[in-house]
């Protein structure tokens, strides 16, 4: 999908630090968790942040 914008990375990293136990490697679960812990009006931005978090967690597991 290409390089993520810095605001997606910054928000994703911040959410991982603050709410590490709420996120997993599953995108669908992360979508709901991001919606609960952050106020993001745009569905597109929410999904991109959830995808970034999922990818970060999955690469850390390897």
Swiss-Prot record:
SUPFAM superfamilies reported in the protein's UniProt record: Rps17e-like
Family, per entry: Belongs to the eukaryotic ribosomal protein eS17 family.
Keywords: Ribonucleoprotein, Ribosomal protein
GO terms of molecular function: structural constituent of ribosome
Lineage: Archaea, Methanobacteriati, Methanobacteriota, Stenosarchaea group, Methanomicrobia
Protein name: Small ribosomal subunit protein eS17
GO cellular component term of the entry, any: ribonucleoprotein complex
BP GO annotations: translation
UniProt xrefs under InterPro entries: Ribosomal_eS17, Ribosomal_eS17_sf
Organism per entry: Methanoculleus marisnigri (strain ATCC 35101 / DSM 1498 / JR1)
């Amino acid at each position: 999908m290409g390089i993520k914008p810095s605001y997606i990375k910054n928000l994703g990293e911040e959410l991982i630090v603050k709410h590490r136990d709420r996120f997993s490697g599953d995108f669908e679960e992360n979508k709901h968790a991001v919606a609960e812990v952050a106020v993001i009006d745009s569905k597109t931005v929410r999904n991109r942040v959830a995808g970034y978090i999922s990818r970060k967690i999955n690469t850390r597991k390897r």
